[in-house]
Amino acid sequence: MNDSQSWSTDDVSVEGFERFIIEYSDMVGREMGGYYYTEIGGTDIKYINSGMGKNNTRTMSYPGPGIFRVRADLYGRVAPHTNWHTHPTNA
C-alpha cells in the first residue's frame, strides 16, 4: 500500500481505505471488519481484506471469507497483521 492515493496504478493508501470504510460503515449503519496483511516476515501492510457486511449489525461484524478464497495466489506469501473493525457513529 502506498502512503498516498495513486490513480495511475490503482494503489490505495491504508489511510484512504480507513477513511472510506469508516464513512461507508456510518452510511450503512453497520460495523465492518476484516484484516490487514503483510508479506511473510514483513511489517508493511500490503493487502486489506474486508467482510461483506451482509449479517453485520451496528455492534457486531464478521470478517467474511479469508483473503485466500479471493486471492489464492497469495497463499504462503502473506500473513495476517491486524484484525480491524469499525464503530458506526450512529450505533
What are these regions (language model features)?
Residues 1-80, 89-91:
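Conserved beta-strand-loop surface patch within small alpha/beta domains used
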Residues 86:
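Conserved residues at the C-terminal ends of beta-strands
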